């Protein structure tokens, strides 16, 4: 990165449009209507906690509402303009300013870029949150609104949360906060109590697939777009990450190996490990590990009696039932937790990723073969 380049943004997914640049929000009409009704009633709450799984449009909705408020300023102006949704035309000056990140009445808080270390800081720091003091203390421009968007609150530590709590406790006039949280239960109860919670739900697979188009640099065919949408479990962000990381092919390779448990094809295992763990393949690594975790979650749900999801590889459903019965549910939950710990420790210690992949499949092989081993010893 050159010195003249803008700093990377932790709330941007790859090369895809940032939520502030996104004009269309699919599948969240109920949440959008709730915000519109609150504003038009003249009783707009000063702080909103937008919750739900990652990648379903929470930040996109926050910026969409911010543009609407900055464009109209008051319910009377919005009503006179005939507003029936939160849409702001892309050629409107407010849209262009917000998209460029240059609107003076919006403050975006996220994990900052550490220029010295050339990476994002691990938390949304207290210094970032304290920027709200000066921002909300200044005079607002046209419309009189000042809007803070926190993406994501999950990244805050205790000090950051306490700094946010102070501004939420004494909100300035015509101030709005949109607090994006994927796991709101981890936030301080006092923060949650000062916000109005707006719960957003995963999108339908068809809505996710509709976003996987040329505008997001997705070149997959219709069947593959729908498969990625289903794998994403209703998250546009995850679907785009799966596309960027070659996730559909990775998932098929992973499942092909898993279907052979309790035996492993060592040659194919090493091919998969090389693909995921090669230097510079960060997207493939993240996507592959996430998809393996998803598969284990589905295995546990299958063992608990939940209906199986649509299969992406022929015979996947039957194989998952067989494996769920090959060991106790507790053993599968235990190995899932151990794999999560192994990956976290490997990232912290910069362990050889190929060794991590081989160890993961060795653990799975051991659990899948435990039932057969018990029968043999009996």
Q: What would you call each of these model-derived segments?
A:
Residues 137, 162-176:
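Conserved catalytic/switch belt of AAA+ P-loop NTPases
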Residues 142-147, 172-178:
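Loop/turn-to-beta-strand initiation segments
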Residues 126, 158-159, 189:
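Conserved D-loop-proximal element of ABC-family nucleotide-binding domains
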Residues 34-39, 92, 123-147, 155, ...:
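Conserved alpha-helical scaffold flanking the Walker A/P-loop in AAA+ ATPase domains
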Residues 116-126, 153, 197:
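Flexible beta-alpha connector loops of hexameric P-loop NTPases
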Residues 1-68, 72-80, 84-87, 93-97, ...:
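Charged, glycine-rich active-site and insertion segments that engage polyanionic ligands
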Residues 51, 150-151:
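Residues at the beta-strand->loop junction immediately N-terminal to the Walker
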Residues 152-156, 168, 184:
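Conserved Walker B
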């Amino acid at each position: 990165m050159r010195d003249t380049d803008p700093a990377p943004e932790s709330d941007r997914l790859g090369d895809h449009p940032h939520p502030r640049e996104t004009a269309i929000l699919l599948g969240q009409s109920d949440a959008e209507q709730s915000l519109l009704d609150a504003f038009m009633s003249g009783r707009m709450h000063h702080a909103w906690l937008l919750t739900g799984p990652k990648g379903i449009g929470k930040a996109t909705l926050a910026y969409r509402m911010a543009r609407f408020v900055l464009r109209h300023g008051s319910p009377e102006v919005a009503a006179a303009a005939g507003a029936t949704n939160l849409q702001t035309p892309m050629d409107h000056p407010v849209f262009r300013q917000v998209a460029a990140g240059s609107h003076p009445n919006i403050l975006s808080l996220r994990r900052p870029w550490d220029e010295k270390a050339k990476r994002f800081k691990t938390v949304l720091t207290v210094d970032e949150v304290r920027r709200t003091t000066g921002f909300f203390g200044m005079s607002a421009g046209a419309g009189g609104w000042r809007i803070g968007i926190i993406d994501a609150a999950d990244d805050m530590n205790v000090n950051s949360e306490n700094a946010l709590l102070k501004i939420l406790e004494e909100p300035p006039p015509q101030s709005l906060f949109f607090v994006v949280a994927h796991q709101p239960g981890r936030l301080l109860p006092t923060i949650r109590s000062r916000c109005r919670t707006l719960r957003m739900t995963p999108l339908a697979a068809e809505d996710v697939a509709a976003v996987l188009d040329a505008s997001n640099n997705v070149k997959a065919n219709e069947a593959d777009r729908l498969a990625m949408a289903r794998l994403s479990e209703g998250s546009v962000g995850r679907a785009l990450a799966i596309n960027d990381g070659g996730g559909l092919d990775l998932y098929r390779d992973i499942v092909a190996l898993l279907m052979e448990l309790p035996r492993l094809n060592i040659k194919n295992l090493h091919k998969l490990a090389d693909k995921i763990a090669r230097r510079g393949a960060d997207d493939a690594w993240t996507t592959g590990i996430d998809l393996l975790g998803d598969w284990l979650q589905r295995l546990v749900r299958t063992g608990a009696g939940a209906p199986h999801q649509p299969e992406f590889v022929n015979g996947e459903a039957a194989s998952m039932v067989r494996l769920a019965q090959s060991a106790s549910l507790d053993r599968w939950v235990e190995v899932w937790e151990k794999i999560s710990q192994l990956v976290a420790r490997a990232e912290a210690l910069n362990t050889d990723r190929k060794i991590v992949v081989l160890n993961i499949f060795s653990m799975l092989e051991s659990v899948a073969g435990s039932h057969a081993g018990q029968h043999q010893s009996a």
